[in-house]
A protein has these predicted regions:
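Charged, terminal alpha-helix-loop-beta segments
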Residues: 1-194
């Protein structure tokens, strides 16, 4: 199991991906932290069935994420790594083939009126297909190529806990760029000959 240490010398142990939590637990943790992780986006649960008329199938995604400037949006499926790849691909194919309409914009707006402009949502959804992203709790290299055929990102969201139960989250894989006001690398000059 992986471990992490913070700047205060507190150790965190990775929560075993296949251990105690269910998909709903992972989804809840992700939705609680998504706007912190991606501060330029507004996120909310998205439990509206999406229909793929080409295959006559429907599936329901977990989350939606809208960029604050209405320049892009994401349909997100949260998955546990222990789930079958076929199950995941079937859902993503539905989201990929769905025709998004004003009805979807109204659904998002009605779920969280504060912070959204209905006309801007309608314009975004009418002019841009959503980007697709699967957020999974463990690396799934065998999913990545198949998901890419639907232009779907694979984001790994791992949960770590210290000995008091305080959480630390690790994000890896493909995801929207995270704009920060600090450098992601730190180089320290240590000893001779450096």
């Amino acid at each position: 199991m992986a471990k992490a240490i913070d700047k205060n010398n507190v150790w965190y142990q990775e929560v075993a991906p296949r251990s105690f939590y269910k998909e709903e637990d992972l989804e809840r943790v992700i939705i609680q932290n998504l706007e912190i992780i991606f501060p330029h986006f507004k996120a909310l649960p998205f439990k509206k069935k999406l229909f793929d008329s080409a295959r006559n199938k429907s599936n329901t995604p977990d989350l939606v994420m809208i960029k604050a400037d209405y320049s892009e949006w994401y349909i997100i499926e949260v998955e546990l790594g222990k789930h079958d790849k076929k199950h995941v691909l079937e859902q993503i194919e539905t989201f990929y083939n769905c025709s998004y309409t004003d009805d979807h914009a109204s659904y998002i707006f009605n779920k969280r009126r504060r912070g959204f402009n209905l006309n801007s949502l309608k314009t975004l959804i009418a002019t841009q297909s959503p980007k697709l992203m699967v957020i999974v709790n463990e690396p799934k290299d065998d999913w990545k190529e198949d998901l890419k055929s639907f232009r779907c990102m694979t984001c790994i969201f791992q949960i770590y806990q210290d000995f008091e139960g305080k959480a630390l989250y690790r994000l890896n894989g493909e995801h929207p760029y995270i704009y920060t006001n600090f450098c992601h690398c730190k180089y320290e000059k240590v000893g001779y000959p450096f």
